[in-house]
Regions:
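C-terminal "post-core" interaction segments
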Residues: 1-190
């Protein structure tokens, strides 16, 4: 089983994930854990690109404007990891584009989502200039999962709820990258 941690959806994230997926495939991994815990989101086009690596077709998410008009955002064909068994890890800090990806994979029955309910961002903010030079930012479009579930204020509810005990601190890859094995062992619970 391979684990792929994605800390944000920045420019080039899809290309980086494709490269990682090729390495995972070459290593003959039997399953993949996509870790989106703590991921605040980012560029929605990168979310579409990444979700599309795992989906054979269909919709990644739906835009719904203030008039209620819904516009589906479709999968980009040619994904390279459409058959590997998949689990997506989420937490309360999984937001925005991360919710699009986890919701799309969950709705398609493509992945089991594990963790706690995500943040519940789910909107596009429009900025409007005011006469005094300031600006007003308000939600102009909301995101729905492919099955029409509202992300805003609801988040993505995991298939399997696993809450972190209050006395356990998360250990993220960057936090342990430079530690020796002895230092990592000293962090383990008694």
């Amino acid at each position: 089983t391979a684990q792929l941690y994605l800390d944000q959806f920045s420019s080039g994230s899809t290309d980086a994930v494709v490269s990682a997926l090729k390495e995972i495939e070459a290593a003959d991994a039997e399953a993949l854990i996509l870790d989106l815990r703590g991921n605040p989101g980012g560029y929605v086009n990168e979310a579409v690109g990444i979700a599309s690596q795992f989906l054979k077709g269909g919709v990644v998410y739906i835009d719904r404007d203030a008039d209620g008009k819904e516009t589906p955002q479709n999968v980009t064909e040619g994904g390279i990891a459409q058959d590997i068994p998949l689990v997506v890890l989420v937490d309360g800090n999984t937001a925005s584009s991360s919710e699009i990806v986890s919701g799309a994979l969950q709705d398609a029955g493509r992945a089991q989502v594990v963790g706690v309910t995500t943040y519940g961002t789910g909107t596009v903010l429009g900025e409007f200039a005011l006469s005094d030079g300031s600006a007003l930012r308000i939600g102009t479009v909301e995101w729905l999962t492919p099955k029409g579930r509202q992300i805003w204020h609801n988040g993505i509810t995991p298939d399997v709820v696993v809450e972190r005990a209050s006395d356990v601190q998360p250990l993220l890859p960057d936090a342990v990258r430079d530690l020796t094995p002895t230092e990592v062992k000293s962090l383990a619970d008694p």
